[in-house]
Amino acid sequence: MPLYFSAHTTACLTKQALRELMKGLLTATDMKVRRCVASQLGGRMLTEVEAPNQPTLEKWFIARRINCEWIMRLDLDGKDGTVTEY
C-alpha cells in the first residue's frame, strides 16, 4: 500500500483538542494512520498514512474536515542506516 506524508494547519486548537484529533486519526479503521506529530505553538500537524492513492486520502481528510496544506507520496525511506523503496 502506498505511503504518504501530509501537513495540516491546526491553529487555535488546544492541546486537548489536538490530542483528541490525533487519537481519532490513529484509531480510524478505514485508513491506516501510522503516525501523527503536532505542534500546538506552530499550529501544524504531520501525518504518515497508508492509502490506496492520493485522491482517496484527500477525500478521507475532507470527510473529517481536516485541512490539508499538502500531501506527498513517499518513494524512499531512510532510517537506521537502511534505505527502503516503496
Regions found by a protein language model. Give the residues of each.
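Conserved short beta-strand edge segments in small beta-sheet-based binding/regulatory domains
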Residues: 66-79
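Short S/T/G/P-rich N-terminal loop/turn motif that feeds into the first structured element of a domain
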Residues: 1-28, 39-43, 52-55, 76-86
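Charge-rich, low-aromatic oligomerization/scaffolding segments with amphipathic character
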Residues: 57-62
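A short linear hydrophobic-aromatic micro-motif
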Residues: 30-37, 70
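Short, structured coil segments at secondary-structure junctions
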Residues: 29, 64-67
